[in-house]
Amino acid sequence: MSKKKILITWPLPEAAMARARESYDVIAHGDDPKITIDEMIETAKSVDALLITLNEKCRKEVIDRIPENIKCISTYSIGFDHIDLDACKARGIKVGNAPHGVTVATAEIAMLLLLGSARRAGEGEKMIRTRSWPGWEPLELVGEKLDNKTLGIYGFGSIGQALAKRAQGFDMDIDYFDTHRASSSDEASYQATFHDSLDSLLSVSQFFSLNAPSTPETRYFFNKATIKSLPQGAIVVNTARGDLVDNELVVAALEAGRLAYAGFDVFAGEPNINEGYYDLPNTFLFPHIGSAATQAREDMAHQANDLIDALFGGADMSYALA
C-alpha cells in the first residue's frame, strides 16, 4: 500500500521529521524563503494532509481554495486562531493543535516577564550593553518585589495554572478570572481566589497576566476601560496572543505612567509590532519565544503528528477542533 502524503510547511525538530517520514511521503518546505499561501495551496493538490504553523493564516478564503483531497490540517501550535474552524467544518477537514507541550515553557516565560518587568531588567541590560552604567547608585533602577503582591491571571487553563504554581514560589497572592471556574481542589492547590467578573479581578491586580485564547470575545479586550480598572502603576504581561491588546492605548498608558511596565512575548501583526514600543524604557519585550524550549517544541511536533496518525489510522477523532 502506498503511503499517504503530507506537506510540512516549516522544518520541525528532527525526531518529529523522522517519525513523519517513516509513516508518510513527506514534502517538507524550508524556512528560507517562507512558504507562501499560494505555494501551500498548489502543493496541497498532491498531498492528503497539511502540517502547518501559526505563520500560515488559513482564513476562510484560504480554506475555500484548499483542494478536496485534503482531509486534515494539523497545526504546530497551541493556538488555532489562524485557522477558520467553521470553514474547515463546512469542508469536512479535521483540524488539530498541540495543546500540551507548551504549558511549562510558556509559564516560565510569563514568570520571566513578570520578574524582568518588576525589576526593570531590560533597562539594566541595555545600560550594560551601551556602556552607560555609571556605577552603583542608591536610587538607580529601583523596581518592585513580587512577594505579597496580587497577580491577576485572566485565563486559568493549563498555562494560567502553571504560572500560578510558579508565582506561589515568589509568595504572590493568586487571583483569577475565567469563564469556567477551576475545581475547588485546583483553587486550593494554587491558593487561588476566583473572581466572577473581569472588572473585579482587574481592580486588585497589581500584576496582570493575559493567558486567554484569542476569540471574538477576547480580541482587543485589553483597552482603555480595562487599563482604567487596574490599580495605578500596574504591571501587565502577555504570553497569550498579541491581538488581545489594544496597542495604541497600552503605549499611551505606559507613556503616561498609568501602567508601570509591560512585558510582552506576543504582538498583533508580529513581527511588525507597534512602533511605540521600541522607544519606551518601561517595556520588557520578547520575540514570541514562549514555547521555545527544546523539549516543548519536540512535544508540540509529535502532537501535531498524532492527529494525522489518528485520522489515517482510523482512530477516534472526537478531540479534533473541527
From Swiss-Prot:
What is the name listed in the Swiss-Prot or TrEMBL entry for this protein? Answer: Glycerate dehydrogenase
Which family does the UniProt entry place this protein in? Belongs to the D-isomer specific 2-hydroxyacid dehydrogenase family.
Its recorded reaction(s) are:
(R)-glycerate + NAD(+) = 3-hydroxypyruvate + NADH + H(+)
Q: How does it assemble?
A: Homodimer.
Its function?
A: Active on hydroxypyruvate and glyoxylate.
Q: Where does NAD(+) bind?
A: 158-159, 178, 239-241, 265, 288-291
Organism of origin: Hyphomicrobium methylovorum
Q: Where are the transmembrane segments?
A: none
Q: What is its EC number?
A: 1.1.1.29
A Pfam family that the UniProt record links to this protein: 2-Hacid_dh
Active-site residues, record numbering mapped to chain: 241, 270, 288
Q: Annotated pathway, please?
A: One-carbon metabolism; formaldehyde assimilation via serine pathway
Stored PROSITE patterns: D_2_HYDROXYACID_DH_1, D_2_HYDROXYACID_DH_2, D_2_HYDROXYACID_DH_3
Recorded GO CC terms:
cytosol
Q: How does activity depend on pH?
A: Optimum pH is 6.8.
Keywords carried by this UniProt record: NAD, Oxidoreductase
Q: Which GO terms describe its molecular function?
A: glyoxylate reductase (NADPH) activity; hydroxypyruvate reductase (NADH) activity; NAD binding
Give induction info. Answer: By methanol.
Q: Which Gene3D superfamilies match?
A: NAD(P)-binding Rossmann-like Domain
Temperature annotation for this entry? Optimum temperature is 45 degrees Celsius.
